[in-house]
Amino acid sequence: MSDKIGLFTGSFDPMTNGHLDIIERASRLFDKLYVGIFFNPHKQGFLPIENRKRGLEKAVKHLGNVKVVSSHDELVVDVAKRLGATCLVRGLRNASDLQYEASFDYYNHQLSPDIETIYLHSRPEHLYISSSGVRELLKFGQDIACYVPESILEEIRNEKKD
């Protein structure tokens, strides 16, 4: 029997504790879980992808079956096929997230019907945490330590120094 391989993707700009919670929970569902950092052309980048990847790798190092990858110019389903993933993992905070994700699910299914999508609902303590909200707090000099993993906080501090 082959390994169950999943792929959880996002821009993770920056990664939040909500993302980490979804990754930890999804890691228990698969033999191997890839976390794919994708460049989103519709979002203005805050942290360079290298910083996001380094911080994310540190945040998930306690999860032996999780590997972080990044992609710039590929569709999610193409990355899933390349990695052998048969399931895409998506996190949902609210109905708006579901509506947004459902349109991608439609196209992904059209392009690759063998790849399933599962949705994990955010835990109540993470429902209102978003990367854009964290960026907004940072813009006004607010403390974000309770919203992001320590490794991400380090990457943000290091980036501010440069």
Curated annotation (Swiss-Prot):
One of its GO terms (molecular function) is ATP binding. ATP binds at residues 11-12, 19, 91-93, 101, 126-132. It catalyses: (R)-4'-phosphopantetheine + ATP + H(+) = 3'-dephospho-CoA + diphosphate. Substrate binds at residues 11, 43, 76, 90. GO terms for biological process: coenzyme A biosynthetic process. The keyword Transferase applies. It holds the Pfam family CTP_transf_like. Pathway: Cofactor biosynthesis; coenzyme A biosynthesis; CoA from (R)-pantothenate: step 4/5. It is an enzyme of class 2 (transferase). SUPFAM superfamilies: Nucleotidylyl transferase. Its EC number is 2.7.7.3. The keyword Cell cycle does not apply. GO terms for cellular component: cytoplasm. Its cofactor is Mg(2+). The record marks 19 as: Transition state stabilizer. Homohexamer. Reversibly transfers an adenylyl group from ATP to 4'-phosphopantetheine, yielding dephospho-CoA (dPCoA) and pyrophosphate. PANTHER family: PHOSPHOPANTETHEINE ADENYLYLTRANSFERASE. Belongs to the bacterial CoaD family. This is Phosphopantetheine adenylyltransferase. It comes from Streptococcus pneumoniae (strain CGSP14).
